[in-house]
């Protein structure tokens, strides 16, 4: 896949998946209306803002790496030709999923909406099942020892403190 095709495909998939999961659906649940803050502490909203600010660039950077380095998209119908192990992928194997859940949970805390916390937990569970049942077996088949080495050094969900460097 050419870089331009990968970029366009990734942009389309971004609108279909993360923008819907972390934008449209949370909006449909909360209408982005503030409720009394969690624990009756207004400062808790700052934690929500921090999660959103961390998550949005994480999704964008990871999508760009799929297109420009992987020469593919995050979508299963147009997977990357190269294993992406740079950027946030040096810290965690699933930065797009981690970032999407961070944005959802950030909105839950910002707007103090328990329903959005539940939605975020369900989305993470869905991502976990997809990763275990489909993505990891597919990546093992596609990239073999390179992916095995990556898995041995980079955690699935909780980021490493230092970046991993492939040898």
Kindly label every feature range from the protein language model:
Residues 1-86, 98-167:
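Membrane-anchoring alpha-helices and their flanking helix-loop junctions
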Residues 89:
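Solvent-exposed interhelical
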Residues 94:
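Extended, alpha-helix-rich binding/interface surfaces that flank or overlap catalytic cores
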